[in-house]
Structures are given as structure tokens and as C-alpha cells.
């Protein structure tokens, strides 16, 4: 079972205590008693999961402002309440929200905007459209109009806030897991191994030996190829190669002259 700490914030007299007591105890408070700080606990089941809620009902903005920062630091989700019969209470929420974001140092703080006392139709000075407009300016923060007297949307605002907290936790866990996986993958792809100085010198010497050995092998292979190529060219020397100038030309001329002399001798013999 998870424990969530919720904080109810707003100006004095907007009905924060009535809203909280109606949710926790199912009772409507018909008398106004300025709250210094009240803490309530309630166990609730949401989406088949059980949660233990600690709800802190705080004083109005004008009272005990020094304690408000402690409330905000410890809170996990915030219900910002104004009264539809009091315009100033909505204006004070603007500053209060900025304070929450500054202390939490985040723009993604679980939060619900609540216009309470919606049952006082004749005393209303803030329309539903104005509440929706403020919600849009705040980044579409969930907006509800409630009535503690009629128990209208009372459970819904607390359930919505708890679901926001759950969603934020799941997203933060997913981001953390993705970051860890990327770090592990980078370690596998590019392992960083540092060698001592002596090992580095040994590796350099072995690399130099291998490189010189490779050059020697290449040169010896080249010489072997040259030695083999010489007899092959002589063996397969073409028959119609042009002879060199010199003695070979002379031998060719003497052979033809001897053939002519033989023919003359043969002819003279037949005449006799």
C-alpha cells in the first residue's frame, strides 16, 4: 500500500476544510473555524490498488505563511481551491501556484484547480468559463467546480490528483530505466580499458615487430615472383619475335647465296 501526501491550498474562507472533511468523513461543516493546520488520513482504492492518503488542510494564504513552504516541500500533490463567490481568492491562487512550482523546481507538479461553493448560484461572481481559461493558462491543469454541501465532485478531485501522482511516478521510472539501458549499451559498444605504461610499451614493440615482419614478407614475396617470371617468359617466347641486328642477318644472306650456287652447278651438270 502506497502512502501519498496531499496538500490543500487556498485563501481563507474558500471551504478547504469543508471539502476535506466531506471527503474523509462524509460530513459537512456548517460553521467556519479558521484552520491553522489539520491532518487527515483516508484509505482509498483506485484502479484496483489501495492507497493511504495523508491530507494536509492548511491555513489561508494570509495566515502562517512561514509554514507554507514546509507544506509544499513535503507534498506530493496539491489541490488549489478558490471560491466562485470571491474573485480575489482566484487571483491569490496565481501567486500560490508560482510558489509551488518554484519550491518543487518543476513544471510537472500534480495539481488540481477547484472552484468551490458552486451551490451558491446567486452569489457567484466567477463563471465556469473563467475557471476553464485559468486551467488552460496553467497547461490544462484539471479543473473542477465542487460543492462540499452537496458533495458534488468531492471524491473526483482527490481521485484525479492521486492518478496524476501515479502517472508521474511511472513516467519518472520509465525515464530512469531508459537512461540506465542507454548507459549499459554504450559501455558494451565502447568498453574503456586502460593499460599500464609497461603494457603499452609492450604493445607498441609488438606492433613494430609485426609491421617490420609484414614488410619483409612482402619484399620476399616480390622477389620470388620476379625469379619465377624469368624462365616463364623465355620458355614461351613467341616464334615471330624480331631478331636482333648483327650476326643473325649475316647468316641469313650466306644461306641464300649457297642455294644459288648449288642450282648453277646442277644446271651445268645436265648440259655436259
Swiss-Prot record:
EC number(s) per entry: 3.6.5.2
Q: Where does GTP bind?
A: 10-17, 57-61, 116-119
What is the membrane topology noted in the UniProt record heading this document?
Lipid-anchor
Is Cell cycle set as a keyword in this record?
yes
Q: What domain of life does the native source organism fall in?
A: Eukaryota
Q: Which CDD domains match?
A: RSR1
As for subcellular location, the record says: Cell membrane
Give the main localization category.
membrane
Q: What is the documented function of this protein?
A: Ras-related protein which binds GDP/GTP and possesses intrinsic GTPase activity. Involved in development of cell polarity during the cell division cycle, and essential for bud emergence.
Record-linked PANTHER family: RAS, DI-RAS, AND RHEB FAMILY MEMBERS OF SMALL GTPASE SUPERFAMILY
Any idea what this protein is called? Ras-related protein RSR1
Query: What organism, scientifically named, is this protein from?
Result: Saccharomyces cerevisiae (strain ATCC 204508 / S288c)
The beginning of the lineage is:
Eukaryota, Fungi, Dikarya, Ascomycota, Saccharomycotina
Gene name for this UniProt entry: RSR1
Amino acid at each position: 500500500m502506497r502512502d501519498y501526501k496531499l496538500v490543500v491550498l487556498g485563501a481563507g474562507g474558500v471551504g478547504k476544510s469543508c471539502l476535506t472533511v466531506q471527503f474523509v468523513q462524509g460530513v459537512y461543516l456548517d460553521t467556519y473555524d479558521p484552520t491553522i493546520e489539520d491532518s487527515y488520513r483516508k484509505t482509498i482504492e483506485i484502479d484496483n490498488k489501495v492507497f493511504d492518503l495523508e491530507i494536509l488542510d492548511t491555513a489561508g494564504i494570509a495566515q502562517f505563511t512561514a509554514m507554507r513552504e514546509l507544506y509544499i516541500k513535503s507534498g506530493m500533490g496539491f489541490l488549489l481551491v478558490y471560491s466562485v463567490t470571491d474573485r480575489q481568492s482566484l487571483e491569490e491562487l496565481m501567486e500560490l501556484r508560482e510558489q509551488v512550482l518554484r519550491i518543487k523546481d518543476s513544471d510537472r507538479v500534480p495539481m488540481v484547480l477547484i472552484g468551490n461553493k458552486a451551490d451558491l448560484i446567486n452569489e457567484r461572481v466567477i463563471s465556469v468559463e473563467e475557471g476553464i481559461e485559468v486551467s488552460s493558462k496553467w497547461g490544462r491543469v484539471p479543473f473542477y467546480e465542487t460543492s462540499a454541501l452537496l458533495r458534488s465532485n468531492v471524491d473526483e478531485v482527490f481521485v484525479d490528483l492521486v492518478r496524476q501522482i501515479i502517472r508521474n511516478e511511472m513516467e519518472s521510472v520509465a525515464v530512469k530505466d531508459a537512461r540506465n539501458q542507454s548507459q549499459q549499451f554504450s559501455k558494451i559498444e565502447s568498453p574503456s580499458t586502460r593499460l599500464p605504461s609497461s603494457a603499452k610499451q609492450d604493445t607498441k614493440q609488438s606492433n613494430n615487430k609485426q609491421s617490420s615482419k609484414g614488410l619483409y614478407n612482402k619484399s620476399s614475396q616480390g622477389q620470388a615472383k620476379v625469379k619465377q617470371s624469368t624462365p616463364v617468359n623465355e620458355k614461351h617466347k613467341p616464334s615471330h619475335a624480331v631478331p636482333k641486328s648483327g650476326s643473325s642477318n649475316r647468316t641469313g644472306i650466306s644461306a641464300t647465296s649457297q642455294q644459288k650456287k648449288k642450282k648453277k652447278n646442277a644446271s651445268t651438270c645436265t648440259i655436259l
